[in-house]
Every structure is written in C-alpha cells, then in structure tokens.
Amino acid sequence: MKASELKDKSVEELNTELLGLLREQFNMRMQASTGQLAQTHTLRTVRRDIARVKTVINQKAGQ
C-alpha cells in the first residue's frame, strides 16, 4: 500500500481501512503466538501499513 493511494481516499475510507488492518494484525498475532504463522514478515508490513494510514488521517485532520 502506497501513501499516494491513501491520500486519494476520504477520512471515512481511511478509518475503514485502519479497522481492517488492525483486525488483520490481531489475527496474525494470534497465529504467530500459536506457531501457525509461516510468513512472519507480514506482521511488519501490516504494522507499517497501519502507520501509513494513521499518518494520512492526521495530515487530513490538520488541513
């Protein structure tokens, strides 16, 4: 996910995206704790996507 794609979305769409990413992160954490997560690098990418979405939301709030 690129920041340029996120800047085109509305705040409501960004909040929906953020909620989905947080759910995905929770599910991945549960899988990692039980040893079922094969690709552990996906946790890092989801965490960074969450940060990107939050950054764009804060930028839009400041405008």
Curated annotation (Swiss-Prot):
Keywords: Ribonucleoprotein, Ribosomal protein
One GO CC annotation: cytosolic large ribosomal subunit
SUPFAM superfamilies: Ribosomal protein L29 (L29p)
InterPro entries given in the database record: Ribosomal_protein_uL29 (IPR050063), Ribosomal_uL29 (IPR001854), Ribosomal_uL29_CS (IPR018254), Ribosomal_uL29_sf (IPR036049)
UniProt-listed GO biological process terms: translation
GO molecular function: structural constituent of ribosome
Disulfides per UniProt: none
PANTHER family: 60S RIBOSOMAL PROTEIN L35/50S RIBOSOMAL PROTEIN L29, LARGE RIBOSOMAL SUBUNIT PROTEIN UL29C
Family listed: Belongs to the universal ribosomal protein uL29 family.
Protein name: Large ribosomal subunit protein uL29
Organism in which the protein naturally occurs: Pseudoalteromonas translucida (strain TAC 125)
